[in-house]
Amino acid sequence: MAILHRYRPRLLKVAAGFTLAALLCVASAAVAATFLDAVLADVAGRTIVASDVAVARGLSLFGARPSDAPIRKGDAERLVDGRLIDQEAAQLAIGGNPQEAEEAWQAAAERVGGMAALHAWMDRSLLDEARVRRLVEADLRWRQFVDLRFRAFVFISEAEVTAALGPETHSQEVRERTRERLRAEATDRDLAEWLSEARKRVSVRYAALGEGGIPLPFPMPPLADQTPKDPARRP
């Protein structure tokens, strides 16, 4: 007991050191959590954050592709466009029913190796499942809006296909692939024109990200290497 009493000040210092280290670890975690939600843009009072971009990339949402590259303004712009489309889809009552929403969720999981892999990635990245589901459902509405509002009204004639291919004879398969490419390009043009006007009708502010952008708040899912086959979903 005398020895403990003699070294008590030193032991208290050691204990205080451990306590301080623990507090610093908690503080570091808090900083990381704050960065997870680093604001990239504001759309009429609703924010786009860094983790939105990471989820969109990881699950191939809104035409994004898996990538560990730094987040740049173009990434924020993609999500802003998605937000504008989602708002318009809501006004037009375009939206997936519960079954379609669940199918979209299952499809998102398959793109990263299955539901278990998706949940493991969300756990590692400290992502709330409800929030990730909302992004997946917004992507579903985005695709439905593009289909119903633009792609459904694009018609490519045989003459246009022939003009694109040239005078040589081509198989029906080649002609159909060309038709789909031309249809996707026309859809993209119409969508870009609509988005240009939509951006003028709403207040959008972007955060300064610098020349090099900012790093992703968490890594991509290990198996996030599959891309949607819908031609209108390319960047």
Q: What are these model-derived regions, one by one?
A:
Residues 28-32:
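Sec/Tat signal peptide C-region and signal peptidase I cleavage site
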Residues 33-50:
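Short N-terminal segments immediately surrounding and downstream of signal-peptide cleavage
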Residues 13-27:
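Bacterial N-terminal signal peptides
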Residues 42, 46, 65-69, 74:
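Short, N-terminal intrinsically disordered low-complexity segments that are rich in Pro/Gly
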Residues 54-68:
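Short, surface-exposed, low-complexity cationic segments
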